[in-house]
């Protein structure tokens, strides 16, 4: 079986789709794990570099449900197209197996492990891409996010009781 130019282009598209899957998955965990209160604390802190990164992310997080819907919608579309393309290039079941393996390892596990540790750094660099995607998907994601806003109410930041704050301080002193 000879590899054609169309096949080569398809494999390049597959690599790009896996990269976008990784981006969506990692950012979903990374950005949604940063609440507005935490970002405000970082922005008011003494580390200027971290404050700048938090300042870039905060406007996205102010529309948390829209951000969530955008990232999830993008991830689903990319992963569905990846599976279809892989199935066309291989036998159906083999394509399903390959696409599932690629999505789990390169589109989920690795990016989520990375973005959970480096959410500010990765998230702040991805703000321009996410902003474009929010604009592109807006007609679909905005109505869904409005339903979530109505059903769930305003997003609450992390609020600690006095006991929890005392324990948090104790843990920080020990580290």
Please give the residue ranges for each predicted region.
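Membrane-embedded alpha-helical segments of inner-membrane proteins
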Residues: 1-175
